[in-house]
């Protein structure tokens, strides 16, 4: 009596008793079909059919050369492409390649030396607030602003003639007197907003003096007295502020302030003949 094979598993067992049949593949249109055989967890033979869609892509030359590498070791006899038994196909990861010009522009923008990211909130200097030398002292920007407001109010009370309105030159002090002693060199000099800073160290420079007074208010000029021979500071300087209230604020803030291991003495400059 002739026996009939009723399933593909029986056909496989009849032809390959001691092992699994080899996998096979064929291409039909834009699809590739791969048939494989393996044992499942229960020890039974199963047939797996994979379907792949063929797509043509333009890849870099380095990728094309890498795909033509000759396989070695146990995969020497494998066909081109990944082997499902030794390679696990993961999700595709897309990478964005930035050109050298774009990288240089981004790098220069981040490291632009002209843009200083550090700004002190105490004295508005080009350093971090934790490193500010005036932190916790009377030179705090908040204290300076309050002092300037108080000094401006006091200056307005002490000098009621300064109401902010325009005053013609001939109505100012000495404006209508011809041949006055104010005519000449001393006529253009106004010492009402000048202060004298004394008890300065010998190593004091114009740059240090500029850093000391610039946060209080704008000034028109300043003079640092120096020795003729050595060039060292004599210990005092004059600063002419643009506004009288700023000069009053400088006296209130800097007078008695410690600077370079010395206590500063700041007062109104006496009128010079």
From Swiss-Prot:
One cellular-component annotation, GO = eukaryotic 48S preinitiation complex
Where is it mostly found?
cytoplasm
Keyword Methyltransferase recorded: no
What's one GO MF term for it?
RNA binding
Family matches, as Pfam families: eIF3g, RRM_1
- Domain spans labelled RRM: 193-271
- List the HAMAP family hit by this protein, alphabetically: eIF3g (MF_03006)
User: Which protein family is it in?
Assistant: Belongs to the eIF-3 subunit G family.
Q: What does this protein do?
A: RNA-binding component of the eukaryotic translation initiation factor 3 (eIF-3) complex, which is involved in protein synthesis of a specialized repertoire of mRNAs and, together with other initiation factors, stimulates binding of mRNA and methionyl-tRNAi to the 40S ribosome. The eIF-3 complex specifically targets and initiates translation of a subset of mRNAs involved in cell proliferation. This subunit can bind 18S rRNA.
Q: What is this protein called?
A: Eukaryotic translation initiation factor 3 subunit G-2
Species source reads Drosophila sechellia (Fruit fly)
What are the leading ranks of the lineage? Eukaryota, Metazoa, Ecdysozoa, Arthropoda, Hexapoda
Which gene name does the record give?
eIF3g2
């Amino acid at each position: 009596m002739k026996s009939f094979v009723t399933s593909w598993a029986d056909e496989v067992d009849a032809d390959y008793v001691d092992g699994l049949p080899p996998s096979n593949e064929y291409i039909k249109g834009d699809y590739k079909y791969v048939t494989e055989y393996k044992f499942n967890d229960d020890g039974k033979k199963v047939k797996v059919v994979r379907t792949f869609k063929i797509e043509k892509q333009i890849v870099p030359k380095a990728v094309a050369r890498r795909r033509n590498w000759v396989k070695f070791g146990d995969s020497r006899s494998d066909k081109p492409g990944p082997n499902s038994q030794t390679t696990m196909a993961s999700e595709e990861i897309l990478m964005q390649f930035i050109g050298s010009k774009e990288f240089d522009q981004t790098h220069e923008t981040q490291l632009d030396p002209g843009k200083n990211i550090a700004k002190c909130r105490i004295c508005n200097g080009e350093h971090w607030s934790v490193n500010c030398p005036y932190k916790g002292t009377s030179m705090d920007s908040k204290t300076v602003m309050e002092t300037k407001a108080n000094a401006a109010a006091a200056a307005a009370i002490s000098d009621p003639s300064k109401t902010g309105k325009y005053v013609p030159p001939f109505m100012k002090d000495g404006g209508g007197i011809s041949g006055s002693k104010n005519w000449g060199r001393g006529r253009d000099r106004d010492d009402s907003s000048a202060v004298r800073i004394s008890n300065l160290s010998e190593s004091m420079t114009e740059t240090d003096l500029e850093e000391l007074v610039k946060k209080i208010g704008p000034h028109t000029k300043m003079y640092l007295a120096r020795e003729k021979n050595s060039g060292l500071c004599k210990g005092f300087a004059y600063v002419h502020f643009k506004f009288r209230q700023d000069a009053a604020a400088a006296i209130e803030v800097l007078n008695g302030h410690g600077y370079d291991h010395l206590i500063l003495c700041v007062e109104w400059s006496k009128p010079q003949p």
